[in-house]
């Protein structure tokens, strides 16, 4: 049994956790069970335009949810497109967005990295209080670890928090976090944990996005 203070801490953590969804058919109805004030992140798919994310965000805007739309850098065409996106977000009074590089192999426009998009966001100006970026405790399938570390540190003056990639190993996450704190990372941390999903689908997704050793460990259990 956990001590009572651990139960309280776990309850607070779960109350502040957020659900990540894709802009798919029927998702609005499935989210109807969530209480007001629940955190919901809306992903940006490489197979759909960023407008699909914005459309779903607008459709959910009157539900009393705390919405966090994802704006993937490689899905934004140019500075003019970014300006339009920011205008839509400002009109909804969105309080937080998440800005990954994106899973698309080739950018559709001028932005190949999250940092480039964040820099233009800062120059254009916006009213979004919190901006999140991605972090990879287990590395990335196409980027070496030192480059990932340097990029995360370079982005932190343009962001307010980071979200770790899905990971199944608590010790690995905590060790990585301690190392990054020692290297100067001060942003608030949101830890990526696996949700309810079919085992094979979850493992396939994990390996595709770069979750390595901890996912392979799960396959043996």
Spans of model-derived segments:
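Active-site pocket-lining/capping segments in soluble small-molecule metabolic enzymes
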Residues: 19-25, 110-136, 184-221
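Active-site glycine-rich loop that binds ribose-phosphate moieties when present
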Residues: 142-157, 162, 172
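Acidic (Asp/Glu)-rich catalytic clusters
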Residues: 10-11, 28-36, 54-66, 85-94, ...
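Active-site-adjacent beta->alpha loops and helix N-cap segments on the catalytic face
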Residues: 25-31, 48-59, 76-84, 104-122, ...
């Amino acid at each position: 049994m956990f001590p009572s203070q651990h139960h309280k801490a776990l309850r607070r953590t779960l109350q502040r956790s957020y659900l990540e969804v894709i802009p798919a058919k029927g998702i609005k109805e499935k989210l109807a069970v969530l209480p007001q004030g629940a955190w919901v992140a809306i992903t940006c798919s490489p197979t759909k335009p960023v407008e699909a994310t914005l459309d779903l965000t607008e459709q959910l805007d009157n539900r009393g949810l705390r919405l966090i739309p994802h704006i993937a850098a490689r899905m934004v065409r140019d500075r003019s497109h970014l300006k339009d996106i920011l205008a839509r977000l400002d009109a909804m009074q969105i309080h937080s967005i998440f800005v990954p590089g994106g899973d698309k192999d080739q950018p559709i426009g001028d932005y190949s990295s999250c940092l480039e998009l964040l820099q233009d966001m800062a120059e254009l100006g916006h009213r979004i209080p919190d901006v999140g970026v991605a972090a990879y405790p287990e590395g990335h399938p196409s980027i070496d670890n030192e480059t990932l570390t340097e990029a995360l540190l370079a982005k932190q003056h343009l962001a307010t928090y980071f979200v770790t990639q899905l990971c199944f190993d608590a010790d690995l996450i905590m060790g990585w976090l301690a190392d990054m704190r020692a290297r100067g990372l001060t942003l608030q941390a949101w830890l990526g944990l696996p949700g309810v999903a079919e085992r094979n689908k979850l493992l396939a997704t994990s390996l595709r996005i770069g979750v390595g050793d901890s996912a392979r460990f799960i396959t043996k259990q």
